[in-house]
């Protein structure tokens, strides 16, 4: 089995990249794909760049060139569900766009034509992620992760997203685009993100301060998953 891993920023993939043996590097547009082995497992690690378009370009290149059997999206997210704190893990059962609106033509909020309203994560991958998080003693929640091309940093923005998607756990800028590409290629995926901020007025300062912690937490969980996948 070859495991695909996607992170947007260098900080989000650095730990995993540095653990890779026999590492090679391929650049496609703004994306970088690192291939090698971690703990004897074949890994294709994508640093996609930030935002939905960069994520889609990179994930398409990853799936076409490296041909992984599954994809794990790792990194950080803003926590908007009650009880979430910095360092906690959110695992996707589904992902949706919070900034897509074709409701004028009868689609659900967040749904794009010719696509489902929600992209469902692979249950086995999500179950494994939860099992590993609990085994590592990490605080974890599962549910809806919403994506959009905005860094959410105000209570008003959170309130609007929660009004449209009451069950949202976390918000970020790539996961649903990655999920859409995986859906199109029929490749199972899951999103595993660590909370770096609360999406409120202090989000930008919190993000800068706690991104290293979020990267460490999410990378530790992904490493646990790698050891179990075969």
UniProtKB/Swiss-Prot annotation:
List the record's Gene Ontology CC terms alphabetically.
Answer: cytosol
What superkingdom heads the lineage? Answer: Bacteria
Q: In which pathway does it act?
A: Amino-acid biosynthesis; L-methionine biosynthesis via salvage pathway; S-methyl-5-thio-alpha-D-ribose 1-phosphate from S-methyl-5'-thioadenosine (hydrolase route): step 1/2
Question: Is-annotated flag, keyword Amino-acid biosynthesis?
Answer: yes
GO biological process terms, semicolon-separated: L-methionine salvage from methylthioadenosine; L-methionine salvage from S-adenosylmethionine; nucleoside catabolic process
**Main EC class of this protein?**
hydrolase
Enzyme Commission no:
3.2.2.9
- Which UniProt keywords are given for this protein, alphabetically ordered? Amino-acid biosynthesis, Hydrolase, Methionine biosynthesis
Decide whether keyword Hydrolase is in the record: yes
What is catalyzed by this enzyme?
S-adenosyl-L-homocysteine + H2O = S-(5-deoxy-D-ribos-5-yl)-L-homocysteine + adenine; S-methyl-5'-thioadenosine + H2O = 5-(methylsulfanyl)-D-ribose + adenine; 5'-deoxyadenosine + H2O = 5-deoxy-D-ribose + adenine
Gene3D superfamilies per UniProt: Nucleoside phosphorylase domain
Provide the residue positions that the database annotates as binding substrate: 78, 152, 173-174
Secretion signal, residue range per the UniProt entry: none
Single Gene Ontology MF annotation: adenosylhomocysteine nucleosidase activity
Any idea what job this protein has? Catalyzes the irreversible cleavage of the glycosidic bond in both 5'-methylthioadenosine (MTA) and S-adenosylhomocysteine (SAH/AdoHcy) to adenine and the corresponding thioribose, 5'-methylthioribose and S-ribosylhomocysteine, respectively. Also cleaves 5'-deoxyadenosine, a toxic by-product of radical S-adenosylmethionine (SAM) enzymes, into 5-deoxyribose and adenine.
Per its record, how is this protein called by name?
5'-methylthioadenosine/S-adenosylhomocysteine nucleosidase
What organism is recorded for this protein? Haemophilus influenzae (strain 86-028NP)
Q: Which lineage do the record's taxonomy fields give for this organism?
A: Bacteria, Pseudomonadati, Pseudomonadota, Gammaproteobacteria, Pasteurellales
């Amino acid at each position: 089995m070859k495991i695909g891993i996607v992170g947007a920023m260098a900080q989000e993939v650095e730990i995993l990249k540095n653990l890779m043996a026999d590492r090679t590097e391929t650049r496609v547009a703004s994306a970088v794909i690192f291939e090698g082995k971690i703990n004897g497992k074949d890994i294709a690690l994508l640093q996609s760049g930030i935002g939905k378009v960069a994520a889609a370009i990179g994930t398409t290149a990853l799936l076409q060139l490296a041909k992984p059997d599954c994809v794990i999206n790792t990194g950080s997210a803003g926590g908007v569900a009650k009880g979430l704190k910095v360092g906690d893990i959110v695992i996707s059962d589904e992902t949706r766009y919070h900034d897509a609106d074709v409701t004028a033509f009868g689609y659900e909020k967040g749904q794009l034509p010719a696509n489902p309203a929600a992209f469902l994560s692979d249950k086995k991958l999500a179950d494994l992620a939860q099992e590993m998080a609990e085994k590592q003693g990490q605080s974890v929640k599962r549910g809806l992760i919403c994506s959009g091309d905005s860094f959410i940093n105000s209570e008003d923005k959170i309130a609007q997203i929660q009004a449209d998607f009451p069950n949202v756990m976390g918000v970020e800028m790539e996961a649903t685009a990655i999920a859409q590409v995986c859906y199109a290629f029929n490749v199972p995926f899951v999103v595993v993100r660590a909370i770096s901020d609360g999406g409120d007025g202090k989000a930008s300062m919190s993000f800068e301060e706690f991104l290293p912690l979020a990267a460490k937490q999410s990378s530790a969980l992904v490493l646990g998953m790698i050891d179990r996948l075969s």
